[in-house]
């Protein structure tokens, strides 16, 4: 496995791979890797001849400096995990390499996809995501980009950017990897106290309740949302950032329970913000 931190070294390797007609898969991460990230790697290795993982905690997508400072860093174990799973190259740049002071900052946005869900409560977050992902796409020149569907809004926004700006990249969403109790895998789970970790299991149980009530014939969106909200709030130390029912493509709020829908939530359990979602079908 190759580990590089400089753009020039990365470009040299990419150039060689392109000359050899390798198919390149790219998995951008912020480190503290877990089995969910490794599912991205496995999917890439099944699709591509070379797999790149980037590890970069991007400061421009944090609207809360405390959140950035608290973000866990485990570079040594991350590299070991990548090597064990057959990653070909890890790009491990510094902030100075990605955002040199000589550059003029550019801001990107897709307003129609950023006004709901996390975009409503985290101003500037997706501008930062689009900025770093577009940079990394240009640097790694992949044929495929792999993104976890736990961050569904991010997946949709990046897919739209690639389509709108004609990036020669195919974006693939990888299903959410879950813990044994159904909680979506996330580096943030490490910050939960034992009691809060138990409380967090309300989130996957809420999705089970959502399916059960839909199959039971619930058709009133307002009533359905109230049922799910009340269930989440049975947990101590829980604060709901949002619980929304939106169109899976446009991410705009729905007014009724007909056909395919995206149920998405962000919940604070203690000080830790957890997100999850599921695409459901109302019969």
From Swiss-Prot:
Annotated binding of ATP, by residue: 30-37, 148-151, 185-188
Pfam families: Pantoate_ligase
Domain of life: Bacteria
Catalytic residue positions: 37 (proton donor)
Catalysed reactions listed for this entry: (R)-pantoate + beta-alanine + ATP = (R)-pantothenate + AMP + diphosphate + H(+)
One record GO biological process: pantothenate biosynthetic process
Annotated residues for binding of (R)-pantoate: 61, 154
Annotated GO MF terms: ATP binding; pantoate-beta-alanine ligase activity
Main location (coarse class): cytoplasm
Any one of the GO CC terms: cytosol
UniProtKB keywords: ATP-binding, Cytoplasm, Ligase, Nucleotide-binding, Pantothenate biosynthesis
SUPFAM superfamilies attached to this UniProt entry: Nucleotidylyl transferase
EC numbers: 6.3.2.1
Biochemical pathway: Cofactor biosynthesis; (R)-pantothenate biosynthesis; (R)-pantothenate from (R)-pantoate and beta-alanine: step 1/1
Binding, beta-alanine: 61
Location in the cell: Cytoplasm
Family stated for the protein in its record: Belongs to the pantothenate synthetase family.
Protein's job: Catalyzes the condensation of pantoate with beta-alanine in an ATP-dependent reaction via a pantoyl-adenylate intermediate.
HAMAP family named among the record's database cross-references: PanC (MF_00158)
Subunit composition and interactions: Homodimer.
Note from the entry: The reaction proceeds by a bi uni uni bi ping pong mechanism.
The protein's name in its UniProt record: Pantothenate synthetase
The organism of origin for this protein: Leptospira biflexa serovar Patoc (strain Patoc 1 / ATCC 23582 / Paris)
């Amino acid at each position: 496995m190759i580990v590089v931190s400089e753009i020039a070294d990365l470009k040299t390797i990419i150039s060689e791979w392109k000359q050899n007609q390798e198919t390149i898969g790219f998995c951008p991460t912020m480190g503290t890797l877990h089995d969910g990230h490794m599912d991205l790697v496995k999917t890439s290795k099944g699709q591509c001849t070379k797999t790149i993982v980037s590890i970069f905690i991007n400061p421009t997508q944090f609207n809360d400096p405390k959140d950035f400072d608290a973000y866990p860093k485990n570079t040594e174990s991350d590299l070991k995990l990548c090597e064990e799973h057959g990653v070909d190259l890890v790009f491990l740049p510094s902030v100075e390499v990605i955002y040199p002071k000589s550059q003029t900052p550019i801001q990107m946005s897709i307003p129609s996809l950023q006004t709901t869900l996390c975009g409503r409560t985290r101003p500037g977050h997706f501008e930062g995501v689009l900025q770093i992902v577009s940079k990394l796409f240009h640097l790694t020149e992949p044929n495929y980009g792999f993104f976890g569907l736990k961050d569904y809004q991010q997946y949709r926004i990046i897919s739209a950017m690639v389509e709108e700006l004609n990036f020669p990249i195919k974006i693939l969403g990888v299903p959410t990897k879950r813990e044994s109790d159904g909680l979506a895998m996330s580096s943030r789970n490490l910050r939960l106290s034992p009691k809060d970790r138990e409380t967090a299991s309300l989130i996957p149980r809420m999705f089970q309740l959502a399916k059960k009530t839909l199959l039971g014939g619930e058709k009133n969106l307002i009533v359905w949302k109230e049922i799910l909200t009340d269930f989440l709030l049975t947990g101590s130390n829980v604060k709901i950032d949002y619980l929304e029912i939106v169109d899976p493509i446009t991410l705009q709020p729905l007014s009724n329970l007909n056909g395919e829908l995206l149920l998405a939530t962000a919940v604070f359990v203690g000080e830790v913000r957890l997100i999850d979602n599921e695409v459901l079908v109302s019969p």
